[in-house]
Amino acid sequence: MTINLPEKEAKRVQIAVDRNPVETSFQKWAKPGHFSRTLAKGPNTTTWIWNLHADAHDFDSHTSDLQDISRKVFSAHFGQLGIILIWLSGMYFHGARFSNYEAWLSDPTHIKPSAQIVWPIVGQEILNGDVGGGFQGVQITSGFFQLWRASGITSELQLYTTAVVGLVLAGAMFFAGWFHYHKAAPKLEWFQNVESMLNHHLGGLLGLGSLGWAGHQIHVSLPVNKLLDAGVDPKEIPLPHEFFLNKQLMIDLYPSFAKGLTPFFTLQWSEYSDFLTFKGGLNEVTGGLNLSDTAHHHLAIAVLFLIAGHMYRTNWGIGHSIKEILDAHKGPLTGEGHKGLYEILTTSWHAQLAINLALFGSLSIVVAHHMYSMPPYPYLATDYATQLSLFTHHCWIGGFCIVGAGAHAAIFMVRDYDPTNNYNNLLDRVLRHRDAIISHLNWVSIFLGFHSFGLYIHNDTMSALGRPQDMFSDTAIQLQPVFAQWVQNTHFMAPQLTAPNALAATSATWGGDVVAVGGKVAMMPISLGTADFMVHHIHAFTIHVTVLILLKGVLFARSSRLIPDKANLGFRFPCDGPGRGGTCQVSAWDHVFLGLFWMYNSLSIVIFHFSWKMQSDVFGTVVNNTVSHITAGNFAQSANTINGWLRDFLWSQSSQVIQSYGSALSAYGLIFLGAHFILLTGMLDIFSGRGYWQELIESILWSHAKLKVAPTIQPRALSITQGRAVGVAHYLLGGIATTWSFFLARIIAVG
């Protein structure tokens, strides 16, 4: 006889909802500040509009009821999905209505992608450059054309249809957001049922999602792309449904289709090796990954996640319990281990969001590095402007997510952390030796900063004194990145031992031959030298400083030596009251503020490194088996001095954007100029003290009051925190737009 212990029994999953919990009221919705008793009274001073923006989405400040907060977040997620679908639909609609997609599809090596035609109002039609094939438009660098070809889209009608479906789905999302807040709102226990959530997200979203995509790739993408690669006119290619209905079409392309589903159900999947391949390397025709490899990959992912979707204990007494796993997770040196973390993650959405943002942001930066080294879509590798744009985009998205992780971890510490429930567990132990963690990070940052910058200073000095033989370079004193070179070589050699059936290594960057498409380099081995070694340590320095700032903000969010009661002051506060020196700009929010600057610094150096390295050592043309790179390999010679970066990268490569006036690239010249002004606005907000503005406003206000023309809503200078927020927003917007215009004008002109 077996007795089930109460904690071993699975909590039965029931979809518990409250019916009609909140009435739909447009009157309430239309009233600014309806979520706050203070704000709903309306404005007395101009501070009101700032507080309105600051608190509109801060659901914690509207109510302390976790169930209501959870419902608001859940509902907002549907709204977010709706907005994303509208945006995506717009992209597909532009492809259908304003693009040269069909022309590009017929000749992707000579025709550039364009999906925007500027209307002639006062001469803007100059922006419609000649992209080839007799089409005038703005060249786009989003990678959508390459994605569409990989999906098997062969006509603009298919893009139209997808755009319409996107709008229908967006409508469904907006409806769901309203329905699940106003009509059938889930109860708190539904949000806290992590096992059921994991099963559905892993098995449903990732498992079935990957399976569906693998199915689409096998039945639509593969046959369409095989015919396109063979040079068949897109208009002659059968429509997607014909490959379903007419089995012979598939058998002609992939003979194993003749065997039907027998090998599938008997698990003889190797019989399908003509379309589920393991080739490695890149497709010689398109320069992208072999789509039969990616179909195989998505099928494998689907199998793994469908299994993972059955791993967690719900209505049946089998599977993992997350609470049991966490509570049992102890090491010999970690006290109570993970005890108490389950309670944190089921009652603090900030804590959960922090972890998810950190992981998602890191993943985005990993994606950035794979998009060029293993370009997943046809003809992506030879579209240099798109390559540069995608790398930059995924780095910045990742950076913002990682800083967001620091922000929400700090908000969790201030608002949700309960010291009484966390005694001697991992979190408590980290907090108790935070001084050691921060001082070590501080030391590492100083060490990396002085030593890596010192190498550059040495080189600049030797260069200025005319002593090239005493510089750190590949031709004088070498600092070769031997570990990185070993990793490259290992990855190049490994497949011959570990995957003998693979035709090539995972990426052409490891070693081997140049992959060229249409006379352009798609990818080739990337050699690393002294200049890479030096800039790598600058990356290490800036990333460690970013981590130092964010982690210090989190670990000292509740208290510090100077302000032991910091938790009572909240997430953001300008100073700790009058009469206490040194307590200004030390809130957790201020650490996020500083973290944003360092994130931007870190990633600027990353994308500059990438842009110059690729132009110097990868991007270029191939004539008679000879590769000519855009900047002829000057990275190794110049990137080892500060002067080299300023002269041969920033100054030399900005000539295209500065001289773009009067050409199709002139918009980038204007953006470059305008974004510098936004950058300066950011600086002004950050550097100027609040007192100066308040004095100025007070004197103007006094004269208005004297003349009895004073406004009813009194002007106020921005608070210190608001000034910093406006400053960092302008700094980032200005910096990103400056870099964007600089990169694109350059690479579109020379690439």
Swiss-Prot record:
It is found in: Plastid, Chloroplast thylakoid membrane. GO terms for cellular component: chloroplast thylakoid membrane; photosystem I. It comes from the Eukaryota. Pfam families: PsaA_PsaB. The keyword Repeat does not apply. It catalyses: reduced [plastocyanin] + hnu + oxidized [2Fe-2S]-[ferredoxin] = oxidized [plastocyanin] + reduced [2Fe-2S]-[ferredoxin]. P700 is a chlorophyll a/chlorophyll a' dimer, A0 is one or more chlorophyll a, A1 is one or both phylloquinones and FX is a shared 4Fe-4S iron-sulfur center. One of its GO terms (biological process) is photosynthesis. Phylloquinone binds at residue 693. It is a multi-pass membrane protein. The chain crosses the membrane at residues 73-96, 159-182, 198-222, 294-312, 349-372, 388-414, 436-458, 533-551, 591-612, 665-687, 725-745. PROSITE patterns: PHOTOSYSTEM_I_PSAAB. The keyword Magnesium applies. Chlorophyll a binds at residues 683, 692. It is an enzyme of class 1 (oxidoreductase). GO terms for molecular function: 4 iron, 4 sulfur cluster binding; chlorophyll binding; electron transfer activity; magnesium ion binding; oxidoreductase activity. InterPro entries: PSI_PsaA, PSI_PsaA/B, PSI_PsaA/B_CS, PSI_PsaA/B_sf. [4Fe-4S] cluster binds at residues 575, 584. The PsaA/B heterodimer binds the P700 chlorophyll special pair and subsequent electron acceptors. PSI consists of a core antenna complex that captures photons, and an electron transfer chain that converts photonic excitation into a charge separation. The eukaryotic PSI reaction center is composed of at least 11 subunits. This is Photosystem I P700 chlorophyll a apoprotein A1. It comes from Stigeoclonium helveticum.
